[in-house]
Every structure is written in structure tokens, then in C-alpha cells.
Design a protein with these regions (language model features):
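Bacterial N-terminal signal peptides that target proteins for export
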Residues: 1-7
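Bacterial N-terminal signal peptides
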Residues: 8-15
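Extracytoplasmic copper-binding redox domains, predominantly the cupredoxin/blue-copper superfamily
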Residues: 21-250
């Protein structure tokens, strides 16, 4: 009986360290972050025609915020230089095993002009998504989380901010957030456990700085055109530039 107890104890000593999870992550050393990945997301083809939004048909107050002018949807925004806006870019694989410090503050999603601002954003796992209303009309914020818990909260004009904790990674794809009152209002929030992500803007470019040397899978995501992935190996103090191109789809 004594020999059996000793054998069980030995097995525990041998196998317990191998079953570690997040506790095995190493604290990030900023001195290692010497590499940078930059790039652009291009659009190949004819710009799709976006039907203007009749805000007045849903809410006169929304239309008044824009002087009655019809607004263009944000689904596909092609920049003047032929690049694509509102594309989420992130390091999909390659930084596992590191525990990165959390940023100060939370991520903000503002309802302004009867739009969600920003249209696409990234945030860190463990941060809160703070939803604010800056409009003189009622909204509701409806999050379709597939990994994080879904939510559906109303926000009348002048209401306090709503803070929603994002406890799990959810970047592939990002979580959709919409307003059920104003059907053109939608946003996409990617929740990532590291700081290496970006969103393309008015020139279609992105930058992922302070990476350690290594091999990475870089994924870009667009709400209409889905994902593209490239693998890149980068050395110490090196900068590499990638180019992604989305073809048009019917």
C-alpha cells in the first residue's frame, strides 16, 4: 500500500507541470519588441454602389442631425487611393506564451449622429466596452457575441454609459453590434488577448509595431469580404511590408 502511494505521488510530480495553462505564460519584456509589420489593404475592382440611407423613414431626429441629407452606408468604403477602409488586421498566431500588460481605460463605442463610432475597432480581452449615447434620440445596443455573452440594452437620450466586460477572445470573426431601432447602425468589435491589431483608415494602411522576431500569421477581416491570411517571418530590428487585396464580390 505504501509503494502504491509513493508511485501515485511520483506521477503527480511528473505530470502536473505539463498541464499548466495561462500560469505558464511569461510576462512580456518590451525590450524584445524590435520588429514591425506594416502594410495596406487594396480593393480590386469597381467600387460597389451603396444605396443612400433614408434616416427620416426611421427617425426624424436622426435625419435632422445631418440636415436631412441622406447618408452613405459604411459597409464598403473604398478610399480615393483604391484601398479599403474599416478592415481589422491582427496577429492571429505567433505570440502565444506571452502575458502582455493591459492598457489603461476601456474601449469606447459612441452612438453619435445615429452612427456607431468607430465602425470597427479592436480591444483587449478583459477590458470593458463602454457604450455611450451622444444623440438626442433613443438607441439600443445589441451585441451578437458568439464567444462573449450576447447583450441587448436600451439607451434613451441622455442615458448613462453602459460598460460591458469582454472576458473572452473573439476576433475571428469580430462581434457584431447593432441598433434594432435604426437598422443601418452596426459596428464590429474584435476582442484580442494581445496588443497586435489595427484597423485601416482613410489610406488603407496598417502598422503592427513592437513585435518580437518570429513567424506570424497575419489575418485581415472585412465585414463583406471576409478574411485573408498571410504568413511572414521577421527578424530583429526588421520592418516588413505586406499587401492584401480584396476582390469584389456580387
Amino acid at each position: 500500500m505504501e509503494k502504491r502511494a509513493i508511485l501515485v505521488l511520483v506521477c503527480l510530480v511528473v505530470f502536473l507541470p505539463a498541464n499548466g495553462g495561462a500560469d505558464d505564460e511569461k510576462s512580456w519584456d518590451p525590450a524584445l519588441g524590435t520588429a514591425t509589420i506594416t502594410g495596406t489593404v487594396k480593393f480590386d475592382g469597381k467600387k460597389p454602389r451603396m444605396r443612400p440611407i433614408d434616416m427620416a423613414g426611421a427617425d426624424e431626429k436622426c435625419a435632422e442631425l445631418h440636415g436631412g441629407a441622406r447618408q452613405k452606408p459604411e459597409t464598403v468604403v473604398v478610399n480615393d487611393n483604391g484601398t479599403l477602409r474599416n478592415v481589422f488586421v491582427w496577429v492571429k498566431t505567433g505570440v502565444e506564451g506571452w502575458k502582455f500588460p493591459m492598457p489603461e481605460g476601456d474601449a469606447l463605442l459612441d452612438q453619435k449622429g445615429c452612427w456607431y463610432l468607430p465602425h470597427v475597432q479592436g480591444m483587449r480581452t478583459g477590458q470593458s466596452l463602454v457604450v455611450r449615447t451622444s444623440d438626442p434620440t433613443a438607441h439600443n445596443v445589441h451585441g451578437f457575441g458568439k464567444v462573449n455573452r450576447p447583450f441587448n440594452r436600451s439607451q434613451p437620450a441622455g442615458a448613462a454609459d453602459i460598460a460591458i466586460k469582454m472576458k473572452r477572445d473573439e476576433a475571428g470573426p469580430p462581434m457584431k453590434v447593432k441598433c434594432d431601432i435604426h437598422p443601418w447602425m452596426n459596428s464590429f468589435v474584435a476582442v484580442v488577448d494581445h496588443p497586435y491589431f489595427a484597423v485601416t483608415g482613410s489610406d488603407g494602411s496598417f502598422e503592427l509595431p513592437n513585435l518580437p522576431p518570429g513567424t506570424y500569421a497575419i489575418e485581415v477581416w472585412h465585414e463583406k469580404y471576409d478574411t485573408i491570411e498571410q504568413t511572414v517571418t521577421i527578424g530583429d530590428n526588421e520592418t516588413k511590408t505586406l499587401e492584401f487585396t480584396y476582390p469584389t464580390k456580387s
